């Protein structure tokens, strides 16, 4: 999940590439398993959505009106599959640029026969800007994004003031931005960004992090980290207006 997010940071003025948006993901080639290739071959025509030039009518896409969540950077798709299977009354949209991950998710969708999940295999910020109508999402999830540890790479982090504002514009009033990270300095950084972002309320009682919500599945990576004494920090912010 850590290499698939995108951030709307702009290069500094005077940069010869200032027309290009700095991205927080790095495209890496990955070897496809048989199942992942099956997912792409059979699932993509059914479940992968193209970038649109106008907001998409997801009621038409899903054939119903239902609570709608979007996850940026779903990695291999295990958590998103589990959430979609556990909540058939809700609709889910996943965004991921890593092709093996997209294939793995789609293979799971086919195997489980899910109908409440659709996928974009492209830049998440492009999806938000071009496809998602304002005030339309009930929840946006960002689990374990790349923290870009080095200071000179912090500009690549997806969580920035401009990202918070873009997400706020897409959430319904009362909608939730749910983030999780396994690196405490990034959790602190997220808090710094969100605490000054207008139009949000931190749902943590202590104004910091919330206990792990039951609706967020625990990944194998997270379980391994827990055995080693590593922490995970969940942050939830509600859109006020």
Swiss-Prot record:
Binding-site list for substrate: 150, 182, 219-222
Ranges annotated as spanning the membrane: none
A GO cellular-component term linked to this record: tRNA methyltransferase complex
Keyword S-adenosyl-L-methionine: yes
Binding site for S-adenosyl-L-methionine: 71, 96, 123, 146
Keyword entries, A-Z: Methyltransferase, S-adenosyl-L-methionine, Transferase, tRNA processing
Cited SUPFAM superfamilies: S-adenosyl-L-methionine-dependent methyltransferases
Gene Ontology molecular function: any one: tRNA (guanine(46)-N7)-methyltransferase activity
Superkingdom of this protein's organism: Bacteria
EC number(s) recorded for this UniProt protein: 2.1.1.33
Pathway(s) where this gene product acts: tRNA modification; N(7)-methylguanine-tRNA biosynthesis
The keyword Transferase is annotated on this UniProt entry: yes
Function: Catalyzes the formation of N(7)-methylguanine at position 46 (m7G46) in tRNA.
HAMAP family attached to this UniProt entry: tRNA_methyltr_TrmB (MF_01057)
This protein's name: tRNA (guanine-N(7)-)-methyltransferase
Organism: Pseudomonas fluorescens (strain ATCC BAA-477 / NRRL B-23932 / Pf-5)
């Amino acid at each position: 999940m850590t290499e698939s997010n995108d951030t709307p940071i702009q290069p500094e003025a005077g940069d010869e590439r200032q027309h290009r948006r700095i991205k927080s993901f790095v495209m890496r080639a990955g070897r496809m398993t048989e199942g992942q290739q099956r997912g792409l071959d059979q699932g993509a025509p059914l479940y992968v959505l193209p970038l649109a030039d106008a907001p998409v009518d997801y009621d038409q896409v899903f054939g119903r009106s239902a609570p709608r969540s979007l996850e940026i950077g779903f990695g291999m798709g295990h958590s998103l599959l589990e959430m979609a299977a556990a909540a058939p009354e809700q609709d889910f949209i996943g965004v991921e640029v890593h092709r093996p991950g997209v294939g793995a998710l789609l293979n799971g969708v086919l195997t489980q026969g899910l109908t409440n999940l659709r996928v974009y295999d492209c830049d998440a910020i492009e999806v938000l800007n071009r496809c998602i109508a304002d005030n339309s999402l009930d929840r946006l999830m960002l689990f374990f994004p790349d923290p870009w540890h080095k200071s000179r790479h912090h500009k690549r982090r997806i969580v920035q003031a401009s990202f918070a504002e873009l997400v706020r514009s897409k959430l319904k009033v009362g909608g939730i931005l749910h983030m999780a990270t396994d690196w405490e300095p990034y959790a602190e950084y997220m808090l710094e960004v969100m605490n000054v972002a207008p139009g949000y309320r931190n749902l943590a009682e202590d104004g910091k992090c919330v206990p792990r919500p039951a609706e967020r599945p625990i990944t194998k990576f997270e379980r391994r980290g827990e055995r080693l004494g590593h922490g995970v920090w969940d942050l939830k912010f509600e859109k006020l207006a």
